Amino acid sequence: MFGSDSVSHDTGWIKVKEIDNEGSYYIFEYRVCAKMVFVHVRNTHYWTVRANNASVTEEKIPQSIAPSIRIPMTVCGLGANISSPSCFIEKDGSVSFYFKNETSYFEAYACYTV
């Protein structure tokens, strides 16, 4: 779903570091700051993010995990119809992931400012 080497619209800042045998989780390495793990729980279609080895979900990310982390939108379970994501380096240095479902784009996570 994400590809083996990089996400679409690769900026050079994000790469897929590891994919487990079943393809159920993805480790992204942000070369400047830290590591993010996106876990897709297939039976619920929810995404979980791991930052600095602390498991967090949706808008419940505590600010203590990383000083620069942003709280993601409440739209976290995007359903089964998810296309490949795009990632962008924003003007403020943060990384944004966008997922497209059937109707519109949601900003899933924007974490780790440079």
Task: Set out the residue ranges of the language-model regions.
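Glycine-rich, low-complexity segments
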Residues: M1-S24
